[in-house]
Amino acid sequence: MLNQIGKKIFLDVNEKYYEYDLKDIFEFQLIKYYVGGNYNWHCDYGEAPVRGSVRKLSMSVHLPAPKEYEGGELNLINYSNYPIMVNNNLGSTIVFDSRIPHKVWPITWGTRIALVGWANGPKLR
């Protein structure tokens, strides 16, 4: 069921904003960040598990309430090359181009949980 919901979100956002050629290949992963946990600046675009396919869209769904941890802010670099902080309210979801650099700042207290996912397709031309 989670896979179907995530797939629908990807397809709806793609149709409205990106119009990428996506294949029926979607990956999802539950990530937990404990105190000190973080993820440095990176891009998700690149080889996907299926040969000849790349990650085109990325998604992050915020699962715990912000009061359950401190730190752990998700930041993205926008197209003007400025960092923006993503809303970390319970259930907040963001879908973005996998070529956009992003990071998660270190957790200073508690545990941050996120569902992340990727929509894949042929390499961009």
Regions found by a protein language model. Give the residues of each.
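Fe(II)/2-oxoglutarate oxygenase catalytic core
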Residues: 1-93, 99-125
